[in-house]
Structures are given as C-alpha cells and as structure tokens.
Amino acid sequence: MMIENQYSLAPALNVDLRKFQRTALIVGMIGVIALIIGFFTTTAEQFLRSYLVGFFFWNGMALGCFVLVMIQYMTGGAWGMIIRRPLEAGTRTWTLCALLVLPILIGVHSLYAWAQPAVVAHDKVLQDKQYYLNVPFFWIRAVLYYAIWGTIITLLNRWSLEQDRTGDLKLAKKLETLSGPGIVIYTFTMTFAATDWIMSLEPHWFSTIYGFIICVGQALSGLSLIVALLVFLGHFQPLSGIVTKRHLNDLGKLLLALVMLWAYLSFSQLILIWSGNLPEEITWYTARLNGGWQYVGAILLIFHFGFPFLLLLSQALKKNPKTIQRIAIYIIVVRIIDVFWLIEPSLHPAHFQLHWLDVVAPIGIGGLWLSHFFYNLQQRPILPPNAPDLEKALNHGRHQH
C-alpha cells in the first residue's frame, strides 16, 4: 500500500482536478441546454449533423486513448508508462460515449438518406446497398461496437488495477496478450463505425483508406490531450520529479509521426480518387473543394499538417514543456476542424456554412466528456506502482542534460 501511496495524486492536484471536473461539467450542462434550444429552433438534420461533429470527435478521443494504451501495453515503452493512467482514464469514458451515441441512433431517419424510404425508392445504388445500410442492422452494429470496445476496455482496466494490488507479473503478460488482437479489433470495428456514422452521410461514396485516416486522427487527438495534461501534471507530485525532457521529446516524436501518417493517408486517398476520376468517388472531393469548403481544406493542409510538422521537427520545442503543451492544445483544435470538414459539406455541398450548433456541440459534449475524464483520473494512482517497466520509465532521461 505504501508503494501505491507513493504515486497517488498530491492533495493540491486533487483539488485542481476536482475544480476542472466541476468546471467541465458546468460547461457541459450549459452546452446541453444550448443543444436543447437548438433542437427546437433548427432543422432536425442540422441539429444532428452538428451533434455528430461533437459526438464523433469526443468518442474518437476515448478510442484514441484506447488504441494508445494498447500500444503501450504491447511495447512497454518508457514514453507510455508515465501516460498510462491518463490513457486508462480516457478509455473508461466509453460508457458516456455509449450514451452519447443514442441521439444518432434515434435520429437516423433525419440524418441519413439511406434511412429514408422515399429517397431509396428512387435510387438504384441505395437499393443495392440496403442489405448493409438499413436501420435495424445500423442499430445492431452500434451495439456490437460498444459491446466489443467496452469488453476489452473493462478487461484491460481490471487487470491493470489488479496489478496495482498484487504485483502479479502474469497480469502484465495478459495485458500484452489482449492488446495485440485488441489493436486489430479496434481498427476493424472503427473502420465499420466510421463507415456507418460518417461515410454513409454520402452513401454513394466509398474509400478503402477512410477508416485508417479516422483511426490515426483519433490516436492523434488522444495523444494531444494526454501530452497537454502531462505538462500540467508535471507541476505536481509525484510527477514533478519524474517527467523529463526526454519523455516530452519522445511524446513529441510520436505526435510528429501521427501528424505525418494522417497527412500521408489523406494525400493517398486524394491521389487515388482523383486519378481514378470515378463519378461515385470524386463527388466527395468536389463538394469539399468548392463553394468555400476549399478554404477549410487549405486550413487543414497548412495547420493540421504543415505548421505542426515544422514545429515538431525541432527537438528544442519538443523538450520545452510550455511549447509542447501549446502545440498539443493547438492540434486538438484543428482535429475538431477536420471532423467538421468530414461531416458538414455533405449537408451544405453548394457553399460553406458554419451553424452556431457546430461550435456549441463540440464544446458542450466536450464538457461532459472532460468532466468524466477528470473524475476517472482521480480514482487511481497516477503511476502504476507494480508495472514491470516502471523503474526503467522513471529513470528515462534522468541523467541527460
């Protein structure tokens, strides 16, 4: 028990986290009230599109934490040991995300053309896709996604907590053994979920790379949140004497790798579709490269890839706590813009339009999510006291200047 206390949150930090939790909850409740007002004052389709932007981003934040913690369990890297507990806290928000998906499931007829019989009756392509794109199967798949994610997340968190209590080395092996197939299962199920919730907004369109782009974006979102949080946690015990510049440099390298991978996959998708020039594929880009939406695309090219790429090349910037924290927060903002760009042009293909709900929904849902996240973070020691590689992680970069 003394080992566990050694890595418990400092009292001052607990006070701050409770403040963050309460503040986030207040923001979330104000956001919910604003969403209710929006529900009664705008069209069902606009409300649900805006809600989908907020839901999909924060659901992706939870799943980004999920895949990152599995990578950490598998590799045992020092970079991940000090962020394991925040990542685990992020994964346990899956229960909230399972509730937040309900408006999408309930509003399916207003949100998706393939769920509207009058539209399907005059569309041969949608008729051919009805075996997959039908409402009962859509609901069943959503339940399956959360059942699968929830089961793996519950097992990982249970074994991690049990390892804290017992120090049983077999549990580390169990975490590693489940995480391997878990990463594959996550990628597979998230590809289908992205197809269901986002790609099917434009049901004639398809892309085989799309699911991978979504998965990488989620990992980038999750890591950005955790890096921003880690710098804050590093001001308090027990992490104030543990987090080194080398830890931050390693996490900065991982951020850079994910930024580059997102850009590579996005560019690959564009080149493949543009060179193929097939009517059912090219329409997705013609909607996003015209009517003002091209400026959002340019913003993503410059600020989602170019700017963070240049910043993260610098080792000095990666090792500077304040700078890497600002970069991480900045990436979170452009990640929301990316999700907005994926969803909204399907509703307004002719011209750019930003509805006030497009701003309110991510903030409101984010308040609820962050409140749950900060609550989870307070429930366990900030470091896993009996993890096999903990000592190596604590000494990572300790003697470097």
Task: Outline where the language-model segments fall.
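N-terminal regions that are enriched for targeting/export leaders
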Residues: 2-62, 130, 392-401
